[in-house]
Amino acid sequence: MNLAQCRMVTDDVAGLAGFYARLLGVPTALNEYYVEIQAGPASVGFSRRRFTEHREADCPSAPGPVRRDGIILDFLVGDVDAEYPRITALGVGWVLPPTTQPWGNRSMMFRDPAGNLINVLSRPDRED
């Protein structure tokens, strides 16, 4: 099984998809219902909240309230530090500045306009 797409549910499809198009540096046709952006072998999709709200389900094993629209997207890049100024120029607020993790990854995290966490990482000591 391979990841084909990570889809985000939002009230502002064009706005959130536009942010990711600028982040990834790819052109895309925007509309208010559904947008898909190719991001390497997988894609990032955006759909309107009213389109998916009836598909929500409870998670009885969760220790507390379930946030039904939360995700973290991981984007692998060659050099985290080289991406930092470009992404900063998009006006993001950093949750974690470029940091080397104990397991060797170099990563930085921020929230997109809808509040989702975005992790941009590189694996300096690994070949992928």
Residues of each region from the PLM?
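Vicinal oxygen chelate
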Residues: 1-4, 25-75, 84-111, 122-128
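Conserved beta-strand-loop-alpha-helix junction that forms the acyl-donor binding cleft
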Residues: 7-12, 102
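Conserved active-site tyrosine of GNAT-family acetyltransferases
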Residues: 16-21, 87, 115
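Generic structural signal for individual residues within well-ordered alpha-helical segments
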Residues: 7, 17, 81-85
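N-terminal amphipathic/basic helix or basic patch
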Residues: 1, 11, 15-18
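Helix N-cap motif at beta-to-alpha junctions
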Residues: 12-13, 78-80
